[in-house]
Amino acid sequence: MPSPGGVRAQVVPLRAGCLDRLHPRAAAGVFWELDPLVAGGGELSPEIDKEAWLVSLAYRQDTVGFSIVDAAGDADAQDALATVLYCPGADAPGAVRMPTAPVSEDAWLVTSLHIDAAVQDRGWESVLLDSVIAASTSAGVPALEVFGLRREAAGETISAACGELVASAAEIGLVEVSILESAGFKVHVDHPAIPRLRLRLPPQFDLLTAREIADLLAEVPAG
């Protein structure tokens, strides 16, 4: 049931001057941002590395991602309940680790989507993905790609390295394939555990309406 006071969560764009409303795992994770083939990467703290990457990216694209925050919470609280980040494929060198890499030359990459367990599977993932789709379409991006997760299929058919990626899915920010497909993405390069999905832009379907988004964000679970 929506809360009587109306929408209690809201989507905020992440752009230059407003990059601090991040999910904690998004703020600390540098899996995508650091090149694993370059020696000396990650010598600073992960938070400093991530902040530097976001600031650099924000000077080149209008929004680098979106977060969902508790609108009724403490105005000074910086942590978001969920965060999605995206960028040109060349700005995510860590993607080389993925078994279905590289990203197509014409595509931007949805690198990560981090979300609190208490608000998973409530449609918030779709709200964030739709926000990225809309912003990317407005920016003239030809296509979006994303590495999806098939956790239930991961087993003896995958390599040890791929198994480590699956085990680290929450830290990396991988999204279940079923959620990505419900947002309009289709498998582009298949894999038992980590396929690469693609969505050509503009999308040939309607995005969530403002009312639908408001209904999905109308209640923030306690705790």
Identify what each model region corresponds to:
Residues 1-63, 80, 84, 145-223:
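Terminal substrate-recognition subdomain of acyl/acetyltransferases
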Residues 56-60, 73-116, 160-163, 167, ...:
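Conserved acyl-donor/pantetheine-binding loop and adjacent beta-alpha core of acyl/acetyltransferases
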Residues 63, 138-141:
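Short, high-confidence coil segments that cap the C-terminus of an alpha-helix
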Residues 67-75, 186:
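Core beta-strand residues in small-molecule sensory/regulatory alpha/beta domains
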Residues 70, 88, 199-201:
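Residue-level signal for short segments within beta-strands and strand-turn junctions
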Residues 89-91, 118, 151, 204:
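Short coil/turn motifs at secondary-structure junctions
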Residues 109, 128-132, 184:
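Short, hydrophobic/aromatic alpha-helical segments in well-folded domains
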Residues 115, 121-137:
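Conserved acetyl-CoA-binding loop-helix of GNAT-fold acetyltransferases
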